[in-house]
């Protein structure tokens, strides 16, 4: 789609390419970076101790993830400098989602990733993206967790009260 993406990979010194290892994907909060998330969360220290690989992507649009249910009622004139991008109708067209999927595939090609142990963690806006990814593509994750950035209830349930889960 013509957009350039940036991400950070962390591979512990103990990595042995003959052995499958877990992958932990850390998603930063709004206006942060993947590298900042790596430092803030200390995932790299845990990766050294536990022997997994980390991936820290940057959100593509001015460090703000394209997430559902947060900015639909947002009026740009209320905060003209806030870099908001509304999500597309079809989740498969969401650049951030496609980037994360492509990065997972890239990591699986580049390293010996255990496909049954891919985890995602997000903080604040990264937690909202983690939930969005898990609800729509969670079949490829072993687990997802986050802190801050709660999800709106209308993103979790449809009009009949059934849980939305396309994974």
What name fits each language-model region?
Residues 161-162:
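Acidic (Asp/Glu)-rich catalytic clusters
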Residues 165-167:
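Catalytic His-Asp charge-relay segment
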């Amino acid at each position: 789609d013509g957009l350039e993406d940036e991400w950070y990979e962390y591979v512990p010194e103990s990595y042995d390419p003959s052995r499958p290892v877990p992958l932990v994907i850390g998603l930063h909060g709004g206006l942060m970076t993947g590298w900042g998330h790596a430092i803030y969360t200390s995932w790299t220290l845990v990766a050294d101790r536990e022997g997994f690989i980390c991936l820290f992507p940057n959100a593509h649009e001015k460090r703000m993830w394209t997430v559902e249910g947060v900015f639909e009622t947002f009026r740009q004139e209320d905060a003209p400098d806030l870099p908001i991008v509304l999500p597309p109708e079809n989740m498969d067209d969401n650049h951030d989602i496609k980037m994360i999927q492509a990065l997972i595939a890239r990591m699986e090609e580049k390293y010996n990733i255990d496909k049954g142990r891919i985890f995602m963690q997000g903080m604040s806006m990264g937690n909202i993206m983690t939930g969005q990814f898990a609800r729509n593509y969670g079949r490829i994750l072993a687990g997802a967790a986050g802190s801050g950035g709660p999800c709106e209830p209308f993103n979790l349930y449809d009009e009949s009260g059934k849980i939305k889960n396309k994974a």
